[in-house]
């Protein structure tokens, strides 16, 4: 498993919009970014793992869609997420 429940809860606490938030775009983007960074490190050791590379590309696409949605709905929140995660967009 990539993320322990404690790590996931920590990420949710850092990006939640309200007290019971687990599904806002900010939280979803942060969780996807954590999984993407884990897989990126994985591929430094396992260069021929093409099956997982496809999964990585799907995660990147999901994150891109969520970022586009957030940018369209609320540019201020979008810029905040980009800055906090250090993404190049």
UniProtKB/Swiss-Prot annotation:
One of its GO terms (cellular component) is cytosolic small ribosomal subunit. CDD domains: Ribosomal_S15p_S13e. One of its GO terms (biological process) is translation. Keywords: Ribonucleoprotein, Ribosomal protein, RNA-binding, rRNA-binding. One of its GO terms (molecular function) is rRNA binding. NCBIfam families: S15_bact (TIGR00952). One of the primary rRNA binding proteins, it binds directly to 16S rRNA where it helps nucleate assembly of the platform of the 30S subunit by binding and bridging several RNA helices of the 16S rRNA. Forms an intersubunit bridge (bridge B4) with the 23S rRNA of the 50S subunit in the ribosome. Part of the 30S ribosomal subunit. Forms a bridge to the 50S subunit in the 70S ribosome, contacting the 23S rRNA. Belongs to the universal ribosomal protein uS15 family. This is Small ribosomal subunit protein uS15.
């Amino acid at each position: 498993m990539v993320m322990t429940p404690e790590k996931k809860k920590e990420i949710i606490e850092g990006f939640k919009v309200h007290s019971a938030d687990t599904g806002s775009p900010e939280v979803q983007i942060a969780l996807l970014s954590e999984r993407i960074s884990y897989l990126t490190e994985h591929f430094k050791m396992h260069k021929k793992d093409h099956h997982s590379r496809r999964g990585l590309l799907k995660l990147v696409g999901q994150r891109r869609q969520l970022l586009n949605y957030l940018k369209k709905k609320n540019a201020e929140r979008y810029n905040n997420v980009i800055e906090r995660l250090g993404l190049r967009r």
